[in-house]
UniProtKB/Swiss-Prot annotation:
NCBIfam families: PRK00147.1, queA. This is S-adenosylmethionine:tRNA ribosyltransferase-isomerase. The gene is queA. Its EC number is 2.4.99.17. One of its GO terms (biological process) is queuosine biosynthetic process. The lineage of its organism: Bacteria, Pseudomonadati, Pseudomonadota, Gammaproteobacteria, Legionellales. It is an enzyme of class 2 (transferase). Keywords: Cytoplasm, Queuosine biosynthesis, S-adenosyl-L-methionine, Transferase. InterPro entries: QueA (IPR003699), QueA_dom1 (IPR042118), QueA_dom2 (IPR042119), QueA_sf (IPR036100). The keyword Cytoplasm applies. Belongs to the QueA family. It comes from Legionella pneumophila subsp. pneumophila (strain Philadelphia 1 / ATCC 33152 / DSM 7513).
Length: 337
């Protein structure tokens, strides 16, 4: 298949620039693969469409304030986006500067703090902080809003560009399907008899990398670190053995589960994955998916197409556009069953 097979015309005013006042005020478009029927609801109603014994798998990765601003000794401006923390003081980062940096260069931050460039690694730079990097980011870092949100980060983003169940720091972009869940929705889901388990996948900046190849099969996915625990494997196997559904909350949770089952059986693991899911892929674990509405020609639209069918995906997205759903990270959600 070609990249343009996944193109759709999205009016710019449908790209959500801010979150709604309340997380669960988001709209919810539900699609059933068996009946090919869909319906329009509010996200707070989602428990009504889940069944006792269903297992929701959520990504508990926490967004870090990964964007830093500084300057070189010459005064030239430098912008960093932390891609991955590799140690207490070391990290890999994308760096924007008027002139490329080299080993041993220093980057000066506010409050008298500084970073040292250790070496270049492909498109990234290995750097060392003057203190614990997470502490430094919490002091000086900015929330790394996606490129399609055309504004600077604000104080509200520290709370709202984060799931209420985020626990493991490491993502530079939110697992956005989880942004709609608030405590009331989680309580209603548990009261329904639905089980919840967690995976961890640290979302990298590569999630926004466009597909440049005409043939989608030629696209090389970015790599991200994920962990599937023994407890999660046990929960998934228990649900499957009872004939219950495993529903991934977000494409990151789905990609983690499918990566851990590449050998045919879900096994505990903690490693990198660059799994690319597009039409023709045979799903091994996931029976349902909760996900936002994604960019045209993106790998995430290709994943949704693999899950519900290409024509069905394009029709569903056109329905969302016609009904004025809000798109992308701060937008509305879909439940695909």
């Amino acid at each position: 298949m070609n990249k343009q097979d996944f193109y759709f015309d999205l009016p710019s005013e449908l790209i959500a620039q801010y979150p709604l006042a309340n997380r669960s005020d988001s709209r919810l478009l539900i699609y059933n693969r068996q009946t090919e029927e869909y319906g329009h609801y509010q996200f707070r109603e989602i428990a009504d469409f889940l069944q006792p014994g269903d297992l929701l798998v959520m990504n508990d990765s926490k967004v870090i304030p990964a964007r830093l601003y500084g300057h070189k000794a010459t005064g030239g401006k430098v912008e960093l986006l932390v891609e991955r923390i590799t140690g207490d003081f070391t990290f890999l980062a994308h760096i924007k500067a008027s002139k490329s940096l080299k080993s041993n260069d220093l980057i000066y931050l506010d409050a008298g703090k500084r970073l040292e460039v250790l070496q270049r690694q492909d498109d990234l730079f290995l750097c060392k902080a003057c203190e614990n990097i997470l502490d430094l980011l919490n002091d000086l870092g900015h929330i790394p809003l996606p490129p399609y949100i055309a504004r600077e980060d604000e104080s509200l983003d520290k709370e709202r560009y984060q799931t209420v169940y985020a626990k493991c720091a490491g993502s530079v972009a939110a697992p956005t399907a989880g942004l709609h869940f608030d405590d009331a929705v989680l309580s209603s889901i548990r009261a329904r008899g639905v089980n919840i388990a967690y995976v961890t996948l640290h979302v990298g900046a590569g999630t926004f990398r466009p597909v440049r190849c005409e043939r989608i099969q030629d696209h090389k996915m970015h790599s991200e670190w994920f962990t599937v625990s023994p407890d999660l494997c046990t929960a998934v196997k228990a649900a499957k053995s009872m004939g219950n559904r495993v529903i991934a909350v977000g494409t990151t949770a789905l990609r983690s589960l499918e990566s851990a089952a590449m050998g045919g059986e879900l096994i505990p693991c903690s490693r990198d994955t660059d799994i690319f899911i597009y039409p023709g892929y045979q799903f091994k674990v996931c029976d349902g998916l909760i996900t936002n509405f994604h960019l045209p020609e993106s790998t995430l639209v290709m994943l949704v197409s693999a899950f519900i069918g290409h024509q069905e995906c394009m029709a569903l997205y056109q329905e969302a556009i016609d009904k004025r759903y809000r798109f992308f990270s701060y937008g509305d959600a879909s439940l695909l069953l």
